[in-house]
C-alpha cells in the first residue's frame, strides 16, 4: 500500500529525479524505525551459487544503487543479495540529461546513463560503512575516456579495490551506453580480459586469504554463435558465473510508444522473453559447469520461474521492482519455495 502511494507520486516526477530522491530517502531511513514503511519478513529459502549460500534466490540488479548508498535499506526489504555499481576507477558524470525514460504502458524503461558514478573509492567507503550482513556483489566497468584496448586495466583497478569487501564481482562488458564496450564480448579481446581477471583473482585470493567469485554480465543482443563463444571462454577461464542479461538495443514490443525511440538500453517487460531465451541457450552451452544469474524483464513470480526453468540459479530484478515494489521479492521467493 505504502509503495503504491509513493510510486504514484514518483511517477509524476522526472525519472532520474525520482530515482535520486528514492535512493536518498532509503539511505536516510536505513537502520532506523522508518524502515517499517518498506521492511518485510521473508522466510529463508537458501540457494548455493558460486560457492556462496544466498538466503534466498532474489537479488537487486546493478544500476539501481550504483554507489552502494542504500544497501541496508534493500536488506530490510528482503533481498537475498544486492549488486551495486556499475562503478569505475574514477568518478564520472555519465551522459547528458535527460537519459532515463519510462515506457509505462509496456512496463519498460530506457536508459543511457553511461556509468555515472562517484568512483570506486567512494563505493568502497560505503561498503565498509554498511551495518548489515547482506551479500553485496560489485559490478565493475571502465571509464568512458579509457580506450577499449586499455579497458582491461580499469577492470583490474576496480577488482583490486573492491575485492576485500565484495561477496562476488560482476564484470560489465555489456552496457550499450559506453562506446565500444560491447566489443569486449568477442574473440581475443574477451579471452584476454577473462584470463587477466582470473589471474588477478588468484593473486588477490592469496593476498586476502579468501576467494571472491567473478561473474561476467552479458548482453541479450547476441547470436547463438556468439553465446556459444562466450560460454567456451567462460569455461576455459574458469569463471564462477554468468549474469544474463543486460539491457537490449531492440525495440520489439514498444514501437509507437512515447519515448520508444530514445537512444539507450531497454529493460523491463519488453526484455522478458529475449533474456529468458539467452539464458536457455547459455545454459545449454555451459552444461551445468557454470551457474547463471538470470535478469531481464522479471515483472512477476511467473517471469522469475521461467528464468529458473531456463537454467538460472539466482534471479535479479530492477525495472520490475520499480513497477511492482518490494512485494515482488516476496512473491518470487514464495513461488520458488512452492515449486
Swiss-Prot record:
Organism taxonomic ancestry: Bacteria, Pseudomonadati, Pseudomonadota, Gammaproteobacteria, Alteromonadales
TM stretches of this protein: none
Positions of substrate binding: 66, 111-115, 172, 177, 246-247
Cellular compartment(s): Cell membrane
Named cofactor requirement(s): FMN
Annotated signal peptide: none
Protein's gene: pyrD
GO MF annotation list: dihydroorotate dehydrogenase (quinone) activity
Active site positions, chain numbering: 175 (nucleophile)
Protein name, UniProt field: Dihydroorotate dehydrogenase (quinone)
PANTHER family in alphabetical order: DIHYDROOROTATE DEHYDROGENASE (QUINONE), MITOCHONDRIAL, DIHYDROOROTATE DEHYDROGENASE (QUINONE), MITOCHONDRIAL-RELATED
Main location: membrane
Keywords: Cell membrane, Flavoprotein, FMN, Membrane, Oxidoreductase, Pyrimidine biosynthesis
